[in-house]
């Protein structure tokens, strides 16, 4: 369980409370962003809201498997953000992301080393560890985008 605790800690670092790798995390970057900025488009870049949705989409999809459901996520739907038209819409998206992230980390913490090495749904997807670490790496990739887009939005105002 030491491995799962370390992996869960890395996951929480990027999403909820860490500063070790990037000196920031999603919660720090997005919590104080008004919905108007979250939906502000800079050229062809994704919006902050779209990136938050995208990361949450994958977390929720893998979380569904952790909780006994099927793997239903598809890349083509991962940016299918419903319209954000109010503070309430934006807050709901963020609250869903934070809640899913904490549930995800909790499931990871409870995984045995043996479970981490089991095939994830199908052998073609690798094992649980690979998929969890993939979510962490994917999250850091987009965290860099979030940070840069946020700076661009602030500079454009």
Q: Where do the model's predicted regions map?
A:
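Acidic/histidine-rich alpha-helical segments that form the ligand environment
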Residues: 84-118, 130-135
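Structured helix-beta-strand junction loops
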Residues: 33-36, 111
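Short, contiguous alpha-helical
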Residues: 2-5, 11-23, 27, 35-80, ...
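Active-site rim elements
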Residues: 8-16, 87-94
């Amino acid at each position: 369980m030491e491995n799962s605790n370390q992996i869960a800690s890395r996951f929480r670092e990027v999403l909820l409370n860490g500063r070790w790798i990037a000196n920031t995390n999603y919660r720090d970057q997005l919590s104080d962003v008004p919905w108007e900025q979250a939906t502000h488009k800079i050229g062809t870049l994704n919006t902050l809201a779209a990136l938050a949705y995208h990361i949450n989409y994958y977390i929720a999809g893998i979380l569904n498997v952790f909780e006994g459901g099927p793997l239903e996520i598809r890349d083509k739907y991962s940016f299918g953000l419903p319209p954000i038209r109010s503070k309430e819409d934006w807050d709901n998206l963020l609250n869903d992301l934070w809640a899913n992230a904490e549930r995800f980390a909790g499931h990871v913490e409870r995984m045995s080393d043996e479970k981490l090495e089991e095939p994830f749904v199908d052998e073609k997807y690798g094992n649980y560890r690979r998929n969890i670490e993939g979510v962490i790496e994917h999250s850091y990739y987009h965290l860099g985008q979030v940070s840069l887009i946020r700076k661009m939005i602030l500079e454009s105002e």
